[in-house]
């Protein structure tokens, strides 16, 4: 992630071979040795993320911050500094919906690039240009499946985020859709509009996605797809992009997304940016398939969400562009590595991890969850989210340091 260069070792080797040189140093061999400085008394270069960590570690000597192992849909992720600078430009910082493409090409192109990136990550054909968050994306996906199948029953996993479940319940109640909850997918699903699962689920468990006899909706945290394979088996993918350079900020704002197969294009909610040509034949961008939307269809629109969180989508687009494929993978790898290291250290303290397979979030079993978390909090460690009296959801990210893990393990109550 250093300097946001996306070149890996293979790419560097190909460039050196093309230039017919052996190393980067060969580019400077024309400079006389007499004028070169052999060594400088400075450390090797580090990435922006590592620099921020080092500066924050010095600032933390005042002990004013908590170490966070909270997750459950909101994560302490690394945010490149330039994201805020670009997002605050007046050209982007607007509530205006780009209905007039002739004056909105920048915003429309960002929306188009966002959709393209989501499609690449999820393996779907089409993505919208954001909705509010993963909760509304999940609920809107259920309504979308009902419009497609004309069936008013939905199978919803008990293991999805409780906040998502709450919003799904509200949407389904208002639209007379019956919900059946499950722990394991039933063998016969043909009588339902959809089966909706979360992977990894709320408790952090990674599960194999099975084929079903109806529409399959997969709810994902997009940052997990830096390492995990895309949910190709799904018909609709819903999720959140908070992990793509969006601060936690008291729980919002977030941005959700819905991606799907091309054949469901006219049922997807939210705005769609398309690429076209202007009167002179030049590439241009515009909102497309607008007959689905409320400014045309009114109460018959596929969705009545008025804001599309485009500014948050811009932040996610910038994040992916800055890190590149390799940087995005590295962030995911570090998150998983830190989580598994913490789980191992907890096991050494006889704290059991319930999960068989997990990414960066897992559930632990303790004797008294309230006492366990209170003791950690008194030591400036937010140890996780209480699930019940004996279980806690714990998350780690690329921002989790070895000192953070030590602070957690060393302050476990006896």
Residue ranges and their predicted role:
Residues 1-39:
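Compact, charge-rich alpha-helical regulatory domains located at protein termini
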Residues 15, 136-282, 346-349, 363-366, ...:
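Conserved PLP-enzyme active-site core in the AAT-like
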Residues 33, 37-112, 296:
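N-terminal entrance/gating region of PLP-dependent enzymes' catalytic architecture
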Residues 99-103, 119-139:
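Short loop-beta-helix segment that forms the pyridoxal 5′-phosphate
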Residues 116, 136-144, 314-318:
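Contiguous, well-ordered alpha-helical segments that form the cores/surfaces of helical PPI scaffolds
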Residues 127, 178-182, 354:
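General small-molecule cofactor/ligand-binding pocket signal
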Residues 244-349, 354-356:
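Active-site C-terminal subdomain of aminotransferase-like
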Residues 326-408:
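Conserved C-terminal alpha-helix-loop-beta "cap" of PLP-dependent enzymes
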């Amino acid at each position: 992630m250093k300097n946001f260069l996306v070149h890996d070792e293979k790419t560097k080797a190909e460039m050196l071979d093309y230039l017919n040189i052996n190393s980067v140093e060969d580019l400077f061999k024309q400079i006389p040795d007499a004028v070169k400085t052999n060594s400088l008394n400075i450390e090797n270069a580090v990435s922006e993320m590592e620099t921020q960590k080092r500066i924050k570690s010095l600032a933390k000597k005042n002990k004013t911050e908590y170490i966070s192992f909270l997750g459950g849909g909101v994560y302490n992720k690394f945010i490149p500094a330039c994201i805020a600078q670009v997002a605050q430009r007046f050209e982007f910082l607007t509530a205006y919906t780009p209905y007039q493409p002739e004056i909105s090409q920048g915003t429309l192109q960002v929306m188009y690039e966002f959709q393209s990136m989501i499609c690449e990550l999820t393996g779907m054909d089409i993505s919208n240009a954001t909705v509010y968050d993963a909760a509304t994306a999940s609920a809107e996906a259920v309504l979308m499946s009902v419009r497609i199948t004309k069936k008013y029953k939905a199978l919803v996993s008990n293991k999805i985020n409780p906040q998502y479940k709450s919003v799904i319940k509200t949407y389904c109640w208002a639209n007379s859709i019956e919900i059946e909850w499950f722990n394991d997918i039933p063998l016969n699903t043909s009588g339902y509009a959809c089966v909706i699962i979360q992977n990894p689920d709320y408790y952090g468990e990674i599960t194999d996605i099975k084929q079903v006899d109806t529409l399959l909706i997969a709810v994902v945290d997009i940052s997990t797809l830096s390492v995990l394979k895309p949910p190709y088996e799904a018909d609709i993918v819903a999720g959140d992009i908070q992990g793509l350079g969006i601060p936690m900020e008291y729980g919002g704002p977030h941005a959700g997304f819905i991606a799907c197969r091309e054949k469901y294009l006219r049922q997807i909610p939210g705005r769609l940016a398309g690429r076209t040509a202007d009167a002179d034949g030049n590439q241009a961008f515009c909102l497309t398939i607008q007959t689905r939307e409320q400014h045309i269809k009114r109460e018959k629109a596929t969705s009545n969400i008025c804001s599309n969180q485009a500014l948050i989508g811009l932040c996610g687009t910038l994040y992916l562009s800055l890190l590149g494929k390799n940087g995005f993978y590295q962030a995911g790898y570090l998150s998983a590595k830190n989580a598994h290291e913490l789980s191992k250290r907890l096991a050494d303290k006889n704290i059991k991890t319930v999960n068989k397979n997990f990414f960066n979030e897992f559930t632990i079993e303790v004797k008294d969850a309230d006492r366990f978390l209170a003791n950690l909090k008194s030591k400036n460690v937010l140890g996780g989210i209480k699930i019940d009296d004996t279980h806690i959801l714990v998350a780690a990210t690329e921002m989790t340091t070895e000192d953070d893990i030590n602070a957690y393990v060393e302050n476990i109550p006896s």
